[in-house]
Curated annotation (Swiss-Prot):
This is Co-chaperonin GroES. Together with the chaperonin GroEL, plays an essential role in assisting protein folding. The GroEL-GroES system forms a nano-cage that allows encapsulation of the non-native substrate proteins and provides a physical environment optimized to promote and accelerate protein folding. GroES binds to the apical surface of the GroEL ring, thereby capping the opening of the GroEL channel. PANTHER family: 10 KDA HEAT SHOCK PROTEIN, CO-CHAPERONIN GROES. The gene is groES. The keyword Chaperone applies. Heptamer of 7 subunits arranged in a ring. Interacts with the chaperonin GroEL. Its main location: cytoplasm. GO terms for cellular component: cytoplasm.
Length: 96
């Protein structure tokens, strides 16, 4: 299934966390928190301003982002979990 996000929305796939600590202890899935980092899969056209003009998003497909803990709506695409976020829910772009 393909989804094209609208306006200032993004489709994000969470980045998987490590299964063990730096000390070598394995972390069970029940003890893990959902990661707050993800890779942008698709972006909308931009945010519509009050004057009717569309402002393009600062984020592009392929960016790795950091987002707030309770942000977005969880969806499943082709059996994989994704999030639909608004640009304002993004805290920053991770540059590597």
């Amino acid at each position: 299934m393909k989804i094209r996000p609208l306006q200032d929305r993004l489709i994000v796939k969470r980045v998987a966390e490590e299964n063990k600590t730096k000390g070598g202890l394995f972390i069970p899935d029940t003890a893990k928190e959902k990661p707050l980092e993800g890779k942008v899969i698709a972006v909308g056209n931009g945010k519509v301003q009050e004057d009717g003009k569309v402002r393009p998003l600062d984020i592009k497909a392929g960016d790795t982002i950091l987002f707030s803990k309770y942000a977005g709506t969880e969806i499943k695409l082709d059996g994989e979990e994704h999030l639909i976020l608004r640009e304002e829910d993004v805290l920053g772009v991770i540059e590597k």
